[in-house]
């Protein structure tokens, strides 16, 4: 995973959040501390779900989450939200009439602007490959799935 540079303000903010989880101030979040915070948010995770959360974040496998591990998680989440925002912006470029769907004509228009001369058949084929529900156009969820599968 590539490192995401966090600002000093972000690190300070994440340290404050970490301290909310770390009730006894020992520098690590235990399953019990995690449970307390999650339950305070009106969620009721099972013991297994709590252990799964810890295991996912706990890179040194000691059963707790230290601040460095918490920071890695937060950096990863920020990266994911940036990628989501980029996909939304890309979708808007294609969805000229902003109706929530990319039609064959909208796709063709964008491809021409990008210097790609596609036949109607090629454009239809591109729509067909991305159009999972078969309605003849590409909605945002289908667009995201298509973009993820490109990588």
From Swiss-Prot:
Q: What does this protein do?
A: Potential calcium sensor.
Instruction: List the SUPFAM superfamilies hit by this protein, alphabetically.
Output: EF-hand (SSF47473)
Query: Per the UniProt entry, what is one GO biological process?
Result: response to bacterium
Subunit organization: Interacts with ZAR1 (via CaMBD domain). Binds to IQD1. Binds to ABCG36.
Protein family membership: Belongs to the calmodulin family.
Q: Where does Ca(2+) 4 bind?
A: 131, 133, 135, 137, 142
The yes or no answer to whether the keyword Repeat is present is: yes
Q: Does the keyword Metal-binding apply?
A: yes
What's this protein's name? Calmodulin-like protein 8
Positions contributing to Ca(2+) 2 binding: 58, 60, 62, 64, 69
| Residues annotated for Ca(2+) 3 binding in this entry | 95, 97, 99, 101, 106
* Stretches assigned to the EF-hand domain: 9-44, 45-80, 82-117, 118-151
Q: Which GO terms describe its molecular function?
A: calcium ion binding
InterPro entries from the UniProt entry: CALM/Myosin/TropC-like, EF-hand-dom_pair, EF_Hand_1_Ca_BS, EF_hand_dom
Tissue spec. comment: Expressed at low levels in leaves, flowers and siliques.
Q: Which UniProt keywords apply?
A: Calcium, Metal-binding, Repeat
Quote the record's binding site residues for Ca(2+) 1.
Answer: 22, 24, 26, 28, 33
């Amino acid at each position: 995973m590539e490192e995401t540079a966090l600002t000093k303000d972000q690190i300070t903010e994440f340290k404050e959040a970490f301290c909310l989880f770390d009730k006894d101030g020992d520098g690590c979040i235990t399953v019990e501390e995690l449970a307390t915070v999650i339950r305070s948010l009106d969620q009721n995770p099972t013991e297994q779900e709590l252990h799964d959360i810890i295991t996912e974040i706990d890179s040194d496998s000691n059963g707790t989450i230290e601040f460095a591990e918490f920071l890695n998680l937060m950096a990863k989440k920020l990266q994911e939200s940036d990628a989501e925002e980029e996909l939304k912006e890309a979708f808007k470029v294609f969805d000229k009439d902003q109706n929530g769907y990319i039609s064959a004509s909208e796709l063709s228009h964008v491809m021409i602007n990008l210097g790609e001369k596609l036949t109607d058949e090629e454009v239809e084929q591109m729509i067909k490959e991305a159009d999972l529900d078969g309605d003849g156009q590409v909605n945002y969820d289908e667009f995201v799935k298509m973009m993820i599968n490109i990588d």
